[in-house]
Amino acid sequence: MAYSDKVIDHYENPRNVGKLDAQDPDVGTGMVGAPACGDVMRLQIKVNEQGIIEDAKFKTYGCGSAIASSSLATEWMKGRTLEEAETIKNTQIAEELALPPVKIHCSVLAEDAIKAAVRDYKHKKGLV
């Protein structure tokens, strides 16, 4: 299976790898996993007073497609509102990275992680 240039780029030069302080009330953390393939993804967002995602970090244990999906998701989330971030779909990630059908689940994980991080943030703020 050949990976697209974008997958290779995000895999070899992942953006926003790291960790934010999960105890910070302005940070939401999403942790998701796919037991079928062993991929585990932690995605975190830091939201400013205006409700804009000012930072996003990830740590992914998994294949190149999972790492690339996480990296791209964090890039796309920065500068967006929570509502805008929640509109990011796995199909958009898969299309942007030209993921083969057998790797689509990696983009699903990224979408799930985005939603989980937003949900965690809203829960911390009493918005849910």
From Swiss-Prot:
Coiled coil: none annotated. GO terms for cellular component: cytoplasm. Pfam families: NifU_N. It comes from the Bacteria. A scaffold on which IscS assembles Fe-S clusters. Cluster assembly on IscU homodimers proceeds sequentially from 1 2Fe-2S per dimer, to 2 2Fe-2S per dimer and finally 1 4Fe-4S per dimer. Subsequently IscU transfers the Fe-S cluster to other acceptor proteins. It is likely that Fe-S cluster coordination is flexible as the role of this complex is to build and then hand off Fe-S clusters. The clusters are very sensitive to O(2). Homodimer. Forms a heterotetramer with IscS; each subunit of the IscS dimer contacts an IscU monomer. PANTHER family: IRON-SULFUR CLUSTER ASSEMBLY ENZYME NIFU HOMOLOG. This is Iron-sulfur cluster assembly scaffold protein IscU. The gene is iscU.
